[in-house]
């Protein structure tokens, strides 16, 4: 039985994180996953920037938008007036000013060799916000989903 435990442990490590396309890695809070996916104060080339996201999900994400702003500034949008989200919930908030962002779109490749094109944009955004979890920053609400770009 002693030999089985190391083998089981090895299998768990090699299996790695596997999550569906619509889910976030369960070891992260939704706000932390939002930050990983969408907050990038200084623009990076899409192929490099998407590695971090794709390594969590173990697949090439088809499209992703990076907001070139701080988590603190995006979280401040959660204090603005609530509006209806695409999913009909009432926890969305629109930015009061446009921000620089990069839209990354998958052009070719299979994980881990994902290749992306980039489009720089200067637009408003809408985020869904929820109360923070224990390990989140201590804001009243934190961004958990990028609902749309305007």
Curated annotation (Swiss-Prot):
Any idea which residues are catalytic in this one? 38 (proton acceptor), 145 (proton donor)
EC numbers listed for it are 3.1.27.-
User: Site: Critical for catalytic activity. Where?
Assistant: 61
Q: Where is this site: Facilitates cleavage of polynucleotide substrates?
A: 59
Keywords, sorted A to Z: Antibiotic, Antimicrobial, Disulfide bond, Endonuclease, Glycoprotein, Hydrolase, Lysosome, Nuclease, Secreted, Signal
Instruction: Note the CDD domains from the entry.
Output: RNase_A_canonical
What Pfam families does this protein map onto?
Answer: RnaseA (PF00074)
Record's subunit section: Interacts (via N-terminus) with bacterial lipopolysaccharide (LPS).
> Mind telling me what this protein is named?
Ribonuclease K6
Protein species of origin? Gorilla gorilla gorilla
Q: Write the lineage as a comma-separated list.
A: Eukaryota, Metazoa, Chordata, Craniata, Vertebrata
Query: What gene name is given for the protein in this entry?
Result: RNASE6
């Amino acid at each position: 039985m002693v030999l089985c435990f190391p083998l089981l442990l090895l299998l768990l490590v090699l299996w790695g994180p596997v999550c569906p396309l619509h889910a976030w890695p369960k070891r992260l809070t939704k706000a932390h996953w939002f930050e990983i996916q969408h907050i990038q104060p200084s623009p990076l080339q899409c192929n490099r920037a998407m590695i971090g996201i794709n390594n969590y999900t173990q697949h090439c994400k088809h499209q992703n938008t990076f907001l070139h702003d701080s988590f603190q500034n995006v979280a401040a949008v959660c204090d603005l007036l609530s509006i209806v989200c695409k999913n009909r919930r009432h926890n969305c908030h629109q930015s009061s000013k446009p921000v620089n962002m990069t839209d990354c779109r998958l052009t070719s490749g299979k994980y881990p060799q994902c290749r992306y094109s980039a489009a720089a944009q200067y637009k408003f955004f809408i985020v869904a916000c929820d109360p923070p979890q224990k390990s989140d920053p201590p804001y009243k609400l934190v961004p958990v989903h990028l609902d749309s770009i305007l």
